[in-house]
């Protein structure tokens, strides 16, 4: 028995046993895959037992900045938030394109085992892709955007893998697209 109760985690009220088989993960996302690769048991606790880790200040900051970015691009904020000031031109352009209906925000895309698009929470959902923004550049091309607020250096490979996955998903969701 592995004891996972903690004084700081009142939601965990009793020890959890680690079974021989950790259980089936029905669907995955890029971040869920990274958790599984790092520690399958952590993935089991999160996805099968449904016990979430407490949020960190860095994660809270990232969530806040993502929300500010979404609200600004949608036109719900008059002024560009200070947290986005380094990318002022990019966010102004994104906002203009959103006003022209050329940008999708916070897309929740589901795919089945054959990479056919399906609902985010359908029974057949095998993969989940959550895009921050997709810009429809023209009839044949799109641009995938995933905001990053954490550590830049040392994460380049992971970030490029995630963008590649999102590009592949874009091709399956929009078969008429030739370039991402």
Model-predicted regions and their roles:
Residues 109-180:
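Mg2+/Mn2+-dependent nuclease catalytic core
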Residues 1-139:
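Metal-dependent nuclease catalytic cores that hydrolyze phosphodiester bonds in DNA/RNA
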